[in-house]
Amino acid sequence: MVGRVVAGGVPIAVEDHGGHGQDVLLLHGGGRSRGDWDAFAGLLVGNGFRPVAMDLRGHGESGEAPWSWREALGDVAAVVEEHGLHRPVVVGHSLGGMVAALWAGEHPECPLAVNLDGHGNPTRPDQFSGLDEGRADDACREMTAFLTEMGRGLPEWFLQVMREIDALDLFAVYRAARCPLLVVSGDAAAFAGMFPERLVPAWNAYCLWTRRQLEAVTEEPSPVRHASLPTGHDPHLEDPRALLRLLLGQLRPA
C-alpha cells in the first residue's frame, strides 16, 4: 500500500509492504527509489517482519525540496510517527545508509541501524592510504575533478546531496552511534569500474583507508560492527537472501 506523509511541507511517498512483527524502515540510495527494496521487502514479510519503504525527498514520488541530513532525518521521523512504526530497524543503502547511521546517533531505542555500502567519496589527500604525499595530492585533485565532471548537468538539489555527503565525517557519525549499528561493505573492486583506468589505483587506496578506519572504529568499545558481502555496491539487489541472512544474524543471534 502506497501513501503520502507530509514532512515540513514536503510530500514523502511511503510504501507499507504489510506483514507482522518487527517494523523495518528501508531507505534507498542516491538517485534511486523505494522500488529498489521490493524483492528484499518480500523476503522480510516472509520472515516475520513488517517492512516499510520510503522515497527520500527529491527521489521517486516524493517532492523536491532543499536537501540536508537534518531535513532527511526529519522526513524519516515523520514516516515513523505517521505509520506507527515501533522502534523500527532502519536499513539504508548508500545515501540511505548514511541517513541510517545518523539515525543511530539520535535513537538509542533503535534495535539496529544498517548502513549498506554507504562509504562516501574521498575529499582529502590523507584518505589515500599507501600513496606518498605528492601522489596522494595528485590523486585527490584528479578524483575531485572527475567527480565534479560527473556532476555536470545534474539538478541543483542532487548536487546539494553530494555536497552533504562530502562534508559528512562518517567515522565521527559511527563513533556517535547510540544503538547497534552495522556497516556492510560490498566488493569495492566492482565499483572501481566507474572510474577511468588511471584513477583505479587512487580508488583502491581510498578503499584501503576506509577499511582501516572501519577496523579502528570496530576495535573500540562501541556498538558498531562491520560485515562484508561478496557483491558489488547493491547487495540488496544482487543477493537479497544473503543480506537477509546477515540481518537475521544480527537481530536473532544464535
How does the language model describe each region?
Residues 13-61:
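Conserved HGGG/HGGXW glycine-rich cap/lid loop of the alpha/beta-hydrolase fold
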Residues 42, 46, 53-91, 231:
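Active-site loop/oxyanion-hole signature of alpha/beta-hydrolase fold enzymes
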Residues 92, 96, 100:
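Gly/Ala-rich beta-loop-alpha elbow adjacent to hydrolase catalytic centers
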Residues 101-105, 110-142:
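Flexible "cap/lid" loop of the alpha/beta hydrolase fold
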Residues 156-173, 209-212:
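Active-site nucleophile elbow and catalytic-triad environment of alpha/beta-hydrolase enzymes
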Residues 177, 183-185:
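Short beta-strand/loop motif that positions the catalytic acidic residue
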Residues 187-231:
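Conserved loop-alpha-helix segment in the C-terminal half of the alpha/beta-hydrolase fold
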Residues 221-254:
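Catalytic active-site module of serine/aspartate enzymes centered on a nucleophile-bearing elbow/loop
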